[in-house]
Swiss-Prot record:
Record has DNA-binding as a keyword: no
Family named by the database record: Belongs to the herpesviridae glycoprotein M family.
Record has Membrane as a keyword: yes
Signal peptide: none
Organism name: Human herpesvirus 6A (strain Uganda-1102) (HHV-6 variant A)
Protein name: Envelope glycoprotein M
Lineage of the species this protein comes from: Viruses, Duplodnaviria, Heunggongvirae, Peploviricota, Herviviricetes
TM helices/strands, residue ranges: 13-33, 77-97, 126-146, 148-168, 204-224, 239-259, 264-284, 294-314
Amino acid sequence: MASSRVDTINLRIWLVSIICAALSFINVTVYLIAINFPNLGFPCAYFEINDLKAVNLSANNQIYQMTHQLYINPVQIICYVLIMAMLFLLIIIYYIVCCAKVFSSNKTSNVNQTTRDITWMGDTSSCFQFILIMDTFQLFVTALSFRLVALGAFAYCIFFVCFTTFNVTLITQFQSADKSFFAFQKIHPNLKGTVQFKTVVINLTELMLGYSTMFLGITTCLGVGNSIYIRSITVAYSSINTFLVMACIYSIVIEAVLVRYVKPLFGYYVGMFCGAVGLSFPILQYETFFESEWSTGLIINLAVIAIISIGFIICRLVRYLVKKKRRYKQLVNTESSSLMDENE
């Protein structure tokens, strides 16, 4: 049976959105590679936004240009940008594989089968959200290169919102868990193999979302600390506390809502733990530079975040295994039980 008109239109729109996402990925990838080389139009190295080793307070008071707050070191920034680029590549590969699978299995007797497959795999709205993620991330890196920390903080907040929306869309497609499970049962049999691929993609995006939560706290407070007069130690504590509050809120939402759609959601908690561990190294440099007596308190706060993340990992593992081993109980036959009562 030929595809319906609705399926044909949705498939073409979806294909155009995937092509746009692929072109945006190529643009962002070339940009992220070019920004690492000097004399290509970028004034500063984006990864040296807070290089404490390059600051010499005894000569020319170089710190007056920008207040150096708590931030991750250049190596961590480069690794973060590189991993995000690899995640973008993985998502593009996922969409291309899904598109190829749908095209190879669009001949079916079911009406609007292609539309149901596209909706469950990742529809046009998720593709354009993915484009917004890449564009806002590119804007964030550009702002760091130009030392516009306030603009960089704003761009990263927009990126984080888009990243969160994309994760929620990829998991739920903005429908109830019952409708999502029903749509999963109705997808084409040839697409069953992409379910595991989608689960891997979701967990990796959740992992980077957890690490990006830490990045959100330190980037936002870096912009605030360079926009208004505020003590550096207050900015440092605000960064960690923002990370803690946001991570707890996201973890509760995952355990209360999102696990009804995808059971093995461990990625965010792992990223949360990696963020706490990764931020501990800059704190040691921060202590050496400022000779701060507050570093112990900062480390304790990070330890609390790490313990909470481990607790959520254990909680998710226990709930996943218990749910997996749960079996249906045999229903009691009310008619036979009533007959037995009468005989007695």
